Curated annotation (Swiss-Prot):
Family classification: Belongs to the connexin family. Delta-type subfamily.
Ranges of the Cytoplasmic topological domain: 1-19, 98-146, 218-370
Keywords: Cell junction, Cell membrane, Gap junction, Membrane, Transmembrane, Transmembrane helix
Lineage: Eukaryota, Metazoa, Chordata, Craniata, Vertebrata
Biological source species: Macaca fascicularis (Crab-eating macaque)
Transmembrane segments: 20-40, 77-97, 147-167, 197-217
Descriptive protein name: Gap junction delta-4 protein
Biased composition (Basic and acidic residues): 246-260
């Protein structure tokens, strides 16, 4: 413990394990209870039995009536109450000092760094970390136990005080116990002063009980806050990524949008027909006719037209525009479809429609097409 001696370390340890409410309670108990009982209660109750007068000459009647009126001396009862209530705090303080001295004998200890807390080491309480990172032992559980005992003792002595003495000292006390004959009236000395002292000590006891409850609640909340949470692995934090973005997708730094992969090129379709359609749109007339013998010629002319197309045109635009306004885009889509599917090179001639022309007209059209 560099720069801190044994006494200073013990004081720091005790100070860190006692809350502000506990310190206020200690001051209240020592000043307002013990000093008032010793300095003010003793003169008031010193001659209590001598001044207790009964209106009878029967021997022993006054002593019996005084025993009924005050089975226990008020002064002794309050002294026992104060000592018993202070006893749990004294035991806790001795325990803390003993453990602190044991820790000091082991040598200087430091609080672990924040990066070491994930490995399971106990973190020092934030309110107990002094300059230099001095580690102070935590006795929160023992402090809560001592508070429970102290509060129970306070409540028990309060109930017993009410059963024995009540709240006020009476002016006279009727007594019917033998050897008294009939009802005997006994008179108490200084009843007003005793009543004021009793009310003051009742208020001190109530305040002590409320401070004990408040200290207990604060200590429980502090213990819950000090409880360490589950450690978070660095790999889990890296995999979680930025909030609002799904895992595995990179984020564009400039626009903040997700980068989408290039879409798969769509399959070119001729005139909206399927992959197995044997129809190809004509360049001149739009009639669908492909004879068996001219399949190779159509394929060669389509490859020439594909070679003439400008290379700067995007593939997506050429593939997604099957209804082009010119007559050059329609024949180009069909040969590309035929080239992509080799099984379509052997196309069966479709059944001639009812409005089809004759064989001579077909030959003339074929010669013009070539």
């Amino acid at each position: 413990m560099e720069g801190v001696d044994l006494l200073g370390f013990l004081i720091i340890t005790l100070n860190c394990n006692v809350t502000m409410x506990g310190k206020l309670w200690f001051v209240l108990t020592m000043l307002l209870r013990m000093l008032v009982i010793v300095l003010a209660g003793r003169p008031v109750y010193q001659d209590e039995q001598e001044r207790f007068v009964c209106n009878t000459l029967q021997p022993g009647c006054a002593n019996v009536c005084y025993d009924v009126f005050s089975p226990v001396s008020h002064l002794r009862f309050w002294l026992i109450q104060g000592v018993c209530v202070l006893l749990p705090s004294a035991v806790f303080s001795v325990y803390v000092l003993h453990r602190g001295a044991t820790l000091a004998a082991l040598g200087p200890r430091r609080c672990p760094e924040p990066r070491d807390t994930a490995s399971g080491q106990r973190r020092c309480p934030g309110s107990c970390r002094e300059r230099g990172g001095l580690e102070v032992p935590d006795f929160s559980a023992g402090y809560i136990i001592h508070l429970l005992l102290r509060t129970l003792l306070e409540a028990a002595f309060g109930a017993l005080n009410y059963l024995l003495f009540g709240f006020l000292a009476p002016n006279k006390f009727p007594c019917t116990r033998p050897p008294c004959t009939g009802v005997v009236d006994c008179y108490v000395s200084r009843p007003t002063e005793k009543s004021l002292l009793m009310l003051f000590l009742w208020a001190v006891s109530a305040l002590s009980f409320l401070l004990g409850l408040a200290d207990l609640v604060c200590s429980l909340r502090r213990l819950m806050r000090r409880r360490p949470g589950p450690p978070t692995s660095p790999s889990i934090r890296k995999q979680s990524g930025a909030p609002g973005h799904p895992e595995g997708r990179p984020t564009d730094k400039e626009g903040g949008r997700e980068q989408e992969g290039a879409p798969a090129p769509p399959v070119a379709r001729a005139g909206g027909e399927g992959a197995g359609s044997p129809r190809v749109t004509s360049r001149v007339s739009g009639h669908t006719k492909i004879p068996d013998e001219d399949a190779s010629e159509v394929t060669s002319s389509a490859s020439e037209k594909l070679g003439r197309q400008p290379r700067g045109r995007p593939y997506r635009e050429a593939a997604q525009d099957p209804r082009g306004s010119g007559s050059e885009e329609q024949p180009s889509a069909a040969p590309s479809h035929l080239a992509a599917h080799p099984s379509c090179s052997r196309l069966q001639p479709p059944d001639p429609p009812a409005s089809s022309v004759g064989a001579p007209h077909l030959r003339a059209r074929k010669s013009e097409w070539v």
